[in-house]
A protein has these predicted regions:
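Electropositive phosphate-/nucleotide-binding environments in soluble metabolic enzymes
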Residues: 23, 27, 60, 132, ...
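ATP-dependent adenylation/nucleotidyltransferase module used to activate substrates
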Residues: 2, 8-163, 169, 199-207
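Short, surface-exposed helix-loop/turn micro-motifs enriched in polar/charged residues
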Residues: 115-118, 152, 216-220, 242
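Short, structured secondary-structure boundary patches
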Residues: 69, 125-137, 170-175, 227-244
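Catalytic subdomain that performs nucleotidyl-dependent activation
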Residues: 158-237
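A short, charged, Gly/Pro-tolerant segment at domain boundaries
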Residues: 241-253
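Residues that form or immediately flank small-molecule/cofactor binding pockets and catalytic motifs
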Residues: 86, 114-117, 194, 217, ...
Length: 253
């Protein structure tokens, strides 16, 4: 059973998501979260979903939304979260805050450890090796603990910036998908924030006082993604509707 529009507006859903008590940014995020889940059939009855919790605003908001969604009767889903620590990267997160945040939302948090040896393949960047090992750790944990879906906190901006990167550097119009079954694991990746704007998540994070993490990855700003985010912002200055044109190009052709 998929999540459908009728379910969202039943009494239980209305009780959990009282729009009249929400700030404007919260309403925008919730509406787009619901639309993404419905349009791309992301939630099904019986799903066991593991959220990849980095500690950033996007994954925190994803925890909050899916925790609320799990309290609705149909479709019934179970939600837990996992935070991965890379032991050989000087990257700090406030684990106590993440544990408290998940506990407040009724979500069990798993702390996982991983690492990588960059000398094994000098052709690969630290970012690639870190991401690959994080994903492998997450996938193996999910399978061994009976999860069938992994929820990632990528929003619409992330997906479109990836599209621009692939067009520019690979000559491909591929990008991250709202739902993606994995070939080598009995898992499906879902991105429930796929239609949500980053600016709205940022506003919610400020209004709800999400705690910003102490330090981000020291290699984050050296990637092409940071440069392409600037390009994306320039496109929106040229045309405020640019994101919707790009989305239609990829997902509505």
């Amino acid at each position: 059973m998929y999540l459908d529009k009728a379910v969202l507006w039943k009494k239980g859903a209305a009780f959990l998501f009282p729009f009249q008590n929400m700030m404007k940014a919260e309403q925008k995020v919730l509406k787009r979260f619901n639309k993404g889940c419905v349009d791309y059939h992301l939630l099904e009855d019986g799903d066991r979903i593991l959220i990849a919790l980095s500690g950033g605003k996007d994954s925190l908001e994803l925890v909050r939304l899916l925790a609320q969604r799990a309290r609705i009767y149909k479709p019934h889903i179970e939600v837990e979260a996992a935070h991965i620590i890379m032991d050989n990267i000087p990257y700090e997160t406030d684990r106590s805050y993440l544990q408290d945040f998940c506990a407040e939302n009724g979500i069990k948090l798993h702390i996982l450890h991983s690492s990588f040896d960059e000398s094994t393949d000098p052709r690969k960047t630290r970012c690639f090796l870190c991401t690959w090992n994080r994903r492998k750790t997450l996938f193996e944990f999910a399978v061994s603990h009976g999860f069938n879906k992994i929820a990632l906190g990528h929003h619409m901006d992330d997906i479109l910036v990836t599209l621009l990167m692939n067009i520019t550097f690979e000559g491909s119009h591929s990008t991250m998908q709202p739902s993606l079954p994995l070939k080598h694991y009995p898992l499906t990746i879902i991105r429930p924030l796929c239609l949500v704007h980053e600016a709205d998540i940022r506003q919610v994070a400020e209004e709800l006082h999400f705690t910003k993490q102490k330090a981000l990855c020291p290699y984050e700003e050296t990637t092409r993604r940071a440069d392409m985010q600037t390009v994306f912002h320039h496109l929106e200055q040229l045309n405020p509707e640019a994101r919707y044109s790009l989305w239609r190009y990829v997902f509505m052709e």
